[in-house]
């Protein structure tokens, strides 16, 4: 966290099964100054997920009430479940100097880029569709029909990677984490993100 600058906002998207969540978790655990925006969702919690940590789990009625209040920076219906990013939560973290990670799908990413053109888009790619299919099957949480739907959707999502600023191939977790960190550090060093420090330096020269 920096006292001199507003935090960057990083949009990290990927097709389901690419390892996005694992990568983001490693980045948060191993590096300072980063916070993840905890999304709201109407889907049931998976084993090991905690409310307020992995997601804010809410009912469909609660979610639709928040939509009516314009509380979301973006939201989407994904396979019958709502997912949304709180505008207030993101703004508070960025204002405090944290770099904020939005772990969202390509539909939500487009909404955020329209609202926040300065946000940095990062797309995580699988090394191949065979590896992606194996990862989805290995999770053991989805039926064969759902897996086929996810693979079909993955092709469309990967086509949308052209709309992002950076792409990272997740073939090796450690290398992919390092690639993500390089992107984060490069964005932190942009002159436009150091204006507060420069002004303070000149004022006290």
Swiss-Prot record:
Primary gene name: gmk
Example GO molecular function: ATP binding
EC number(s) stated in the UniProt entry for this protein: 2.7.4.8
Location in or out of the cell: Cytoplasm
Source superkingdom: Bacteria
Protein name, as recorded: Guanylate kinase
Reaction(s) catalysed by this chain's protein: GMP + ATP = GDP + ADP
Entry GO terms, CC: cytosol
Residues annotated to bind ATP: 14-21
Major location (coarse): cytoplasm
Alphabetical UniProt keywords: ATP-binding, Cytoplasm, Kinase, Nucleotide-binding, Transferase
Organism per entry: Neisseria gonorrhoeae (strain ATCC 700825 / FA 1090)
Zinc is among the record's keywords: no
Protein family per UniProt: Belongs to the guanylate kinase family.
Residue ranges constituting the Guanylate kinase-like domain according to the UniProt record: 7-185
Function comment: Essential for recycling GMP and indirectly, cGMP.
Stretches that traverse the bilayer: none
């Amino acid at each position: 966290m920096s006292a001199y600058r507003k935090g960057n906002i990083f949009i990290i998207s990927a097709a389901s099964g690419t390892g996005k969540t694992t990568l983001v978790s490693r980045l948060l655990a191993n590096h300072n100054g980063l916070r993840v925006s905890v999304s709201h969702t109407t889907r049931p919690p998976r084993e090991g997920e905690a409310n307020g940590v992995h997601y804010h789990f809410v009912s469909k009625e609660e979610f639709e009430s928040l939509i009516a209040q314009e509380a979301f920076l973006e939201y989407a219906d994904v396979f019958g479940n709502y997912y949304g990013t709180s505008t207030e939560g993101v703004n508070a973290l960025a204002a405090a100097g944290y770099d904020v990670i939005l772990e969202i799908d390509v539909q939500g990413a487009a909404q955020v880029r329209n609202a926040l053109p300065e946000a940095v888009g990062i797309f995580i790619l699988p090394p191949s569709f065979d590896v992606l299919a194996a990862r989805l099957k290995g999770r053991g949480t989805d039926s064969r029909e759902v897996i086929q739907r996810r693979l079909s959707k993955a092709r469309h999502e990967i086509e949308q990677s052209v709309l992002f600023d950076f792409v990272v191939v997740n073939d090796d977790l450690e290398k992919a984490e390092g690639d993500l960190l390089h992107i984060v550090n490069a964005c932190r060093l942009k002159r436009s993100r150091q204006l507060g420090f420069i002004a303070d330096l000149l004022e006290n020269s």
